[in-house]
Swiss-Prot record:
Residues 1-23 are annotated as: Disordered. Coiled coil: none annotated. This is ATP-dependent RNA helicase HAS1. GO terms for molecular function: ATP binding; ATP hydrolysis activity; RNA binding; RNA helicase activity. It comes from Kluyveromyces lactis (strain ATCC 8585 / CBS 2359 / DSM 70799 / NBRC 1267 / NRRL Y-1140 / WM37). The Q motif is unique to and characteristic of the DEAD box family of RNA helicases and controls ATP binding and hydrolysis. One of its GO terms (biological process) is rRNA processing.
Length: 497
């Protein structure tokens, strides 16, 4: 990457909520801390861990696995990419093994996670870990075939990975689903589960599940009041609070090189196109703020012979799953996506995270960049696009302990394909329509940002934004701004469609 680099320090304190009933055990390093062979695990688990290529534990595994093996409840705070999936699966599998769980005993462990992709990923890790065990495992997620799931549950699934909505559905409606013998409950990405609106479902699930002699573990990248409330109703009194991040200098992975570029709206796509062209041999994830923007830019880039994959919430589950695994297995390539891919997904060897549309807040930023530099020795780079009016976001990142460099790209290295882009959008009816949808959705997403002091829609230059979607003049679109549903006259754009 060319250009000057001005290092900006980003250090400040980050508070973690504490409750009186919680025992503190704080590790201050994310370095490798111990060996799996020290844990005295079953032969089947050790064989699987060896086959997966792991010998040393990460900090969160070192701190978490021994108390979980001893039967304690754990409330874990660890940044994304810290290795927590193994930290909760290994003790769960060991418990099922020691209790000699059979299919007829029903479900002994339930893992609840916010998204279908994350559930599939945890399921994949569980499948590898259980290769040499006799216990059964399964997954229930929205969008999958409910009847097939019910059939498997009735045959007996010892360890079940689930999203909240579908799990509640089966708990309430699937006769023959045996969960009375539940021994452990894992709630992963608890803050995200609550953020996306599953608070009521979680309360109902916890009410239905047996809690006598049940071990519980709750993991959350951030500790909020709602997470504390969920911990209070799901964990036994006096859980062990394990925080491997509280005294670290940064909130992001150590092997992550992070930067931002200041770019006017009309030059954003040209810079992105130039960057992707030069990095076609790398593995890159590009984040956008809306499904329609993803659809447009993915279609456009593929049309102009820059092959990309797309992942967003409007796709059918099978398509999302196929795309996710295709990108996982690729040595290089570009994935254009919404935040559906930002949380917890473990995609191997990602070189670059590009935040083309800005994240809503520092937490979203941290989870987006968490797709690279994963594990103990992970390396990766991230680049965030900001317009001159959005630079206030850097203050929030600094307060969240995110270290950033500023990158400058020489203008002579940026491909000037604006005229060709506008000509293409004008002549291709389909691209014209999805460009218009993308433009409208970008404005709508911008208007709904929570950091109103940073992302001010009145300060957007619509003519420049339109150019990044291939329009010489802003198209007429209709968006709703603000809680009142009223659209300021200066921003009102009516459309006939």
């Amino acid at each position: 990457m060319a250009g000057n680099k001005r290092v900006r320090d980003a250090e400040s304190e980050q508070d973690h909520a504490e409750t009186e009933t919680v025992v503190k055990d704080t590790a201050t390093t994310g370095e490798v801390e111990g060996s799996f062979s020290d844990l005295k695990l079953s032969d089947g688990t050790m064989k699987a861990i060896g086959k997966m290529g792991f010998t040393q534990m990460t900090a969160v595994q070192t701190r978490t696995i021994p108390p979980l093996l001893a039967g304690k409840d754990v409330l874990g705070a660890a940044k994304t990419g810290s290795g927590k999936t193994l930290a909760f699966l290994i003790p769960a599998i060991e418990m099922l093994h020691s209790l000699k769980f059979k299919p007829r005993n029903g479900t002994g462990v339930i893992v609840i996670t916010p998204t279908r992709e994350l559930a599939l990923q945890i399921f994949g890790v569980a499948r590898e870990l259980m290769e040499f065990h006799s216990q059964t495992f399964g997954i229930v997620i929205g969008g999958a075939n409910r009847r097939q799931e019910a059939d498997k549950l009735m045959k007996g699934v010892n360890i079940l990975i689930a999203t909240p909505g579908r799990l509640l559905d089966h708990l309430q409606n699937t006769k023959g689903f045996i969960f009375k013998n539940l021994k452990a409950l894992v709630i992963d990405e608890a803050d995200r589960i609550l953020e996306i609106g599953f608070e009521d479902e979680m309360r109902q699930i916890i009410k239905i599940l047996p809690n006598e002699d049940r071990q519980s573990m709750l993991f959350s990248a951030t500790q909020t009041t709602k997470v504390e409330d969920l911990a209070r109703i799901s964990l036994r009194p006096g859980p062990l609070f394990i925080n491997v991040d509280s005294e670290k200098d940064t909130s992001t992975a150590d092997g992550l090189e992070q930067g931002y570029v200041v770019c006017e709206s009309d030059k954003r796509f040209l810079l992105l196109f130039s960057f992707l062209k030069r990095n076609q041999k790398k593995k890159v994830i590009v984040f956008l703020s809306s499904c329609n923007s993803v659809k447009y830019y993915a279609e456009l880039l593929n049309y102009i012979d820059l092959p990309v994959l797309e992942l967003h919430g409007k796709q059918k589950q099978q398509k999302r799953t196929n795309t996710f695994f295709e990108f996982c297995n690729a040595e290089r390539g570009i994935l254009v996506c919404t935040d559906v891919a930002a949380r917890g997904l473990d995609i191997p060897a990602v070189d670059w995270i590009i935040q083309f549309d800005p994240p809503d807040d520092p937490r979203d930023y941290i989870h987006r960049v968490g797709r690279t530099a994963r594990g103990t020795k992970g390396k990766g780079k991230s680049l965030m696009f900001l317009t001159p009016t959005e630079l206030g976001f850097l203050r929030y990142l600094k307060a969240a302990k995110v270290p950033l460099n500023e990158y400058e790209f020489p203008t002579n290295k940026i491909a000037n394909v604006q005229a060709q882009l506008e000509k293409l959008i004008k002549s291709n009816y389909y691209l014209h329509q999805i460009a218009k949808d993308g433009y409208r959705s970008y404005l709508q997403a911008y208007a709904s940002h929570s950091l109103k002091t940073v992302y001010q829609i009145d300060k957007l230059d619509l003519a420049k934004v339109a150019k990044s979607y291939g329009f010489p003049v802003p198209p007429k679109v209709n968006i709703t701004i603000g809680a009142s549903g009223k659209t300021p006259a200066t921003k009102k754009r009516r459309t006939k469609d």
